[in-house]
């Protein structure tokens, strides 16, 4: 019997509709394409670093939990460890989800996020929550630190602005990018957040140099940077006290000196997990000074492994960009890895008492909520922007040749 045309077709038991089957095949195909194009080496290195962070937070959690417990509220020794697992789970989902986005979507999303977090940064001094003398968080049911989520969006937006130069060399891209950087740094210093301001300036400097700036301008930029550091020293008491303490040498009661002593206490092989004692006197053992906890409990050899993993991540991104043919991709990935690498090595230098204290976490290792999600977002953007078909050959991007071609094309039109 032929079914009526007015009745919907109902498949028999065990029969699949071709549309549903195609949809499943499309999803599988997209996953296969993603897995083929993604930088799997970078993904494995990041997951390795996060695994090290999981163990390190477990080691540091008892010290911080006991330090922050009160007579009214007693925190479980592994309180921060269990919270960290939740943040890591959300972070990995964020990283993988963002890494699947097409490059254009990743760029547009980052620009929108940059605008939204800039608004949040403007609101922080007025409605933000104050912690340890600084207003950095917005609280509306959850705590959000706009400066953390702004970092990856800022790097991509800055790369997008500087890449305009290829389309029209006459555009004042350096001035536009510099104005954005100055605006953000000014908002950060109002909190104040000197450590994040250094990262934003460093990211801007890396991208401006890579964009092919005239060498004659570098001296002027360096001079402006020196003036900015001097003004910060003179105008901000917190920054001046930290720099003076660093230059004057630590004392037994200085937290940076305590961090260095804790780091060295474990020797080459460490005292063993949960067997360290110096970490108990460290403030923020699970965040700012987790590298020192790693040194005390697991030894300097494991500290060296952590440093090598960071170097491997940086090297992998740079190798991936060697034959890249798109200026925007080169700049955005360079800016993102500059943020992660810069934050990592500032934190490590602080723990070694080679840099003034900045209140900065160790990326992908330290405990954190906003910082963990934001760093996983950073890696996700990096993975999305550097995706490529491994079977296609690529020509290395030449900025000078691109600018010369643009000039020739304009000359021909005139």
Residues covered by each model-derived region:
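Membrane-helix boundary/helix-loop-helix interface segments in multi-pass membrane proteins
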Residues: 2-49, 55-191, 348-363, 367-377, ...
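Transmembrane alpha-helix boundary/anchor motif
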Residues: 93, 101, 157, 230, ...
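Interfacial segments of multi-pass membrane proteins
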Residues: 162, 198-217, 278-302, 359-373
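Hydrophobic, glycine- and aromatic-enriched re-entrant/interface helices and adjoining loop segments
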Residues: 131, 135-137, 219-306, 324-332
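Alpha-helical transmembrane segments of multi-pass membrane proteins, especially transporters
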Residues: 148, 173-177, 200, 221, ...
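Hydrophobic alpha-helical segments of polytopic membrane proteins
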Residues: 93, 111-118, 170-234, 246
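Hydrophobic alpha-helical transmembrane segments
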Residues: 85-91, 296-317, 378
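Loop-to-helix entry and N-terminal half of a specific, functionally important transmembrane alpha helix
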Residues: 321-359, 365
């Amino acid at each position: 019997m032929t079914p009526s045309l007015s009745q919907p077709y109902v498949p028999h038991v065990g029969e699949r509709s071709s549309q549903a089957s195609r949809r499943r095949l499309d999803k599988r195909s997209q996953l296969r394409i993603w897995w083929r194009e993604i930088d799997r080496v970078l993904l494995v290195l990041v997951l390795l670093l996060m695994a090290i962070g999981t163990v390190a937070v477990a080691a540091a959690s008892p010290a911080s939990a006991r330090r922050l417990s009160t007579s009214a509220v007693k925190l479980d020794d592994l309180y921060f460890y269990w919270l960290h697992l939740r943040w890591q789970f959300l972070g990995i989902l964020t990283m993988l989800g963002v890494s699947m986005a097409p490059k254009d979507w990743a760029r547009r999303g980052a620009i929108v996020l940059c605008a939204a977090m800039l608004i949040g940064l403007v609101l922080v001094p007025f409605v933000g929550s104050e912690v340890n003398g600084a207003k950095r968080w917005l609280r509306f049911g959850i705590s959000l630190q706009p400066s953390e989520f702004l970092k990856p969006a800022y790097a991509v937006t800055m790369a997008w602005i500087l890449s305009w130069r290829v389309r029209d060399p006459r555009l004042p891209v350096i001035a536009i990018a510099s104005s954005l950087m100055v605006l953000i740094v000014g908002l950060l210093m109002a909190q104040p957040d000197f450590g994040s301001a250094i990262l934003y300036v460093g990211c801007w400097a890396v991208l401006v140099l890579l964009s092919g700036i005239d060498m004659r301008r570098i001296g002027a930029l360096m001079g402006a940077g020196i003036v900015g550091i001097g003004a910060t020293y003179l105008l901000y008491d917190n920054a001046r006290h930290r720099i003076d303490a660093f230059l004057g040498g630590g004392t037994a009661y200085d937290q940076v000196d305590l961090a260095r002593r804790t780091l060295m206490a474990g020797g080459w092989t460490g005292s063993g997990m949960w067997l360290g004692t110096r970490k108990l006197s460290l403030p923020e053992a699970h965040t700012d000074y987790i590298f020192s906890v790693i040194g005390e409990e697991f030894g300097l050899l494991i500290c060296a492994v952590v440093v090598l993993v960071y170097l491997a991540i940086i090297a992998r991104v740079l190798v991936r960009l060697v034959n890249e043919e798109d200026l925007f991709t080169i700049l955005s990935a360079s800016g993102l890895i500059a943020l992660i690498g810069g934050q990592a090595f500032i934190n490590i230098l602080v723990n070694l008492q080679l840099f003034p204290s900045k209140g900065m976490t160790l990326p992908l290792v330290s405990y954190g909520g906003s910082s963990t999600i934001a760093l996983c977002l950073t890696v996700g953007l990096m993975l999305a922007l550097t995706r490529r078909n491994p079977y296609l050959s690529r020509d290395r991007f030449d900025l000078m040749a691109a600018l010369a071609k643009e000039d020739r094309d304009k000359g021909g039109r005139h």
